[in-house]
Amino acid sequence: MVKIKILKKTEDSITFILEGVSVAFANALRRTILGEVPTFAVDEVEFYENDSALFDEIIAHRLAMIPLKTPTDRFELDALELDDYTVTLSLEAEGPGIVYSGDLKSDDPDVKPVTPDIPIVKLAKGQRLVFNAYAKLGRGKDHAKWQPGFTYYKYFTRVHISKKINGWEKLAKLAKKRGLPTKENEEEVIVETIKPFYIPKEFEEYEGKEIWEEIVPDTYVFVVETNGELPVEEIVKIALRILMRKADRFINELQRLAG
């Protein structure tokens, strides 16, 4: 049975244990989060004036990398075919001063820069910058600007520490200081590595013998971080629904071919 246990959740990241799946599924989830979950990003820019020190292409690239809020209630983000919808972000600025992401005017109030203080370009006195930037939905597999964030996973393991070691108490205290769950019996201390646990150099001679690591089958520690376009929990939910839709499409195609 597949189980998910949330270990830690903040505004921009989530850490959870995923249990009961193969490494192939864990990697598929990771790849789907990075490459398939869609977000809005600037894809085309039309310049009318640019007296700044930067070429049009450089400004366009900077605009493309600004994270844009992506409303989950208006778009079917788990669909295999994306909605063809364009948002216009316009700007008319004159120096002296710095142009920030918050200066962009969106024709859709739900799609706007995540943070207003990302610098775009510095204008000297008399310099002007006028453009329309067009944002659309896209996927990270086509360009990194559409990635909703970052994710990685590791095998969930247990480190067994024998009490025959002189100074085993130090390792137990170190694990607790790191916030790692520990269990103890008469013979050993067991540390659950929900995050990395590094053995001090003075204990290296015991590794593989009195200190050994057990890999828990089909169990992984996932960390997902968001750029701000989507709530972090929505990124995981959308990725799982996309995987389900792809599996359903594959099964339907097999059934069709089987006649």
From Swiss-Prot:
- Keywords in UniProt for this one? Cytoplasm, DNA-directed RNA polymerase, Nucleotidyltransferase, Transcription, Transferase
InterPro entries for the chain:
DNA-dir_RNA_pol_30-40kDasu_CS, DNA-dir_RNA_pol_insert, DNA-dir_RNA_pol_RpoA/D/Rpb3, RBP11-like, RNAP_Rpo3/Rpb3/RPAC1, RNApol_insert_sf, Rpo3/RPB3_RNA_Pol_subunit
Q: What is one GO cellular-component annotation here?
A: DNA-directed RNA polymerase complex
Kindly give the SUPFAM superfamilies that the UniProt entry links to this protein: Insert subdomain of RNA polymerase alpha subunit (SSF56553), RBP11-like subunits of RNA polymerase (SSF55257)
PROSITE patterns tied to this protein: RNA_POL_D_30KD
Q: What class of enzyme is it?
A: transferase
Q: Where's it found, cell-wise?
A: Cytoplasm
Alphabetically, the GO molecular function entries are: DNA binding; DNA-directed RNA polymerase activity; protein dimerization activity
Organism domain of life:
Archaea
Matches recorded under Pfam families: RNA_pol_A_bac, RNA_pol_L
Which EC number(s) are documented for this chain?
2.7.7.6
UniProt KW NADP keyword? no
Function, as annotated, reads: DNA-dependent RNA polymerase (RNAP) catalyzes the transcription of DNA into RNA using the four ribonucleoside triphosphates as substrates.
Return the PANTHER family for the record: DNA-DIRECTED RNA POLYMERASE, DNA-DIRECTED RNA POLYMERASE II SUBUNIT RPB3
Please give the HAMAP family that the UniProt record associates with this protein.
RNApol_arch_Rpo3
What the record says about family reads:
Belongs to the archaeal Rpo3/eukaryotic RPB3 RNA polymerase subunit family.
Record text on subunit structure and interactions: Part of the RNA polymerase complex.
Protein's name according to its UniProt entry: DNA-directed RNA polymerase subunit Rpo3
Species annotation: Pyrococcus horikoshii (strain ATCC 700860 / DSM 12428 / JCM 9974 / NBRC 100139 / OT-3)
Gene name per UniProt: rpo3
